[in-house]
Amino acid sequence: MKGKLINSFLMKKPKISVIGAGKVGENVAYLLTILGLGDVYLFARYKKGLEPAKAKALDLKQMAVLMDIDINVKGISYDKEGFEELKGSDIVVITAGIPRREGMSREDLLYENLKILKKFTDAIKEYAKDSIIIVVSNPVDTLTYATIKLTGFEPRRVIGMAGVLDSARFKNFVKEKIGISNADIRTLVLGTHGDLMVPVTSHSFIGDKPIEEVFSASEIDELIEKTRKGGAQIVSLMGTSAYYAPAASVVIMVESIINDRKRVMPCSVYVEGEAAKHYEIEGVCIGLPVVLGKKGVEDFELVNLSGYEKRELLRSAKTLKEMVSLADKLLNEL
């Protein structure tokens, strides 16, 4: 019996690396730890003599001990120690990047975040070439595309976190309006992670009823507007971006991959094959419903959209094509 217990404890656990220990990164690490999904490696910069990744990892490790969660948590100051600890990662989550500052153009912001991203993708190629990457940094759709280009990974192994969060926000606003259990509400948001996201009301339900049968057109318009402005509302109230719900969205994706759950969820993915024909979109990463399992994106869910929803999705894709063209230009300058 004792030998079996020891063998169980020593069994190899999934390794999940999180690059960036800001609010989103640290909360991803926290949730991964509390759920015991695998060993957690937290990477961050060495700042003015301080090592936040090491400090936060130590705190999380002590929490895990307190709660009898048998995983390892380690912090790495990557500009001091490098990225060698990425070796053996099953999943790498990229949360690091800079927010848009006053006076920065869209091109300036993208260029700066591409430079940061390239440092990470070079390290992932060297040390974690078999991993699945989840991109959280913004602009997430464009940086997911750039990650595929920079790593040369199969597109199914590079996934952007967007639609899971946007769908949760849509669900929250529906719940606030009707006041029933979360479990009985299903919502779907596709497209870009931004003002051109597409809340898909034809595939959003309260119980067995489409929300279009529950709410009036004006009420639905209000719900859509609230969903599109959900992130901006938090910024206006707090002065910084959300982090609890984004972190939870990442961890839901990680859990489906690690445990091969094959859950269907909207993610920013590179559109190809049958999905490209169905949605009439190609050459970009955009939020679509996919099956997430141990291989990453295992399949596309081909949703039949209304005429209006299809037009809105194509409008979203057109904007992303412009960003992709800009990204290709800037990548050549790196």
UniProtKB/Swiss-Prot annotation:
Gene3D superfamilies from the UniProt entry: Lactate dehydrogenase/glycoside hydrolase, family 4, C-terminal (3.90.110.10), NAD(P)-binding Rossmann-like Domain (3.40.50.720)
InterPro entries tied to this protein: L-lactate/malate_DH (IPR001557), Lactate/malate_DH_C (IPR022383), Lactate/malate_DH_N (IPR001236), Lactate_DH/Glyco_Ohase_4_C (IPR015955), Malate_DH_type3 (IPR011275), NAD(P)-bd_dom_sf (IPR036291)
- The catalytic residues are 193
Listed GO biological process terms: carboxylic acid metabolic process; tricarboxylic acid cycle
What is a single molecular function from GO for this protein? L-malate dehydrogenase (NAD+) activity
Q: Report one GO cellular component.
A: cytoplasm
Its Enzyme Commission number(s) read 1.1.1.37
Pfam families assigned to the protein according to its UniProt record, in alphabetical order: Ldh_1_C (PF02866), Ldh_1_N (PF00056)
UniProt keywords, alphabetically: NAD, Oxidoreductase, Tricarboxylic acid cycle
User: Which family does the record assign?
Assistant: Belongs to the LDH/MDH superfamily.
Matching entries from NCBIfam families are given as: PRK06223.1 (NF004863)
Name by which UniProt lists this protein: Malate dehydrogenase 2
- Organism expressing this protein natively: Aquifex aeolicus (strain VF5)
By which gene is this protein encoded? mdh2
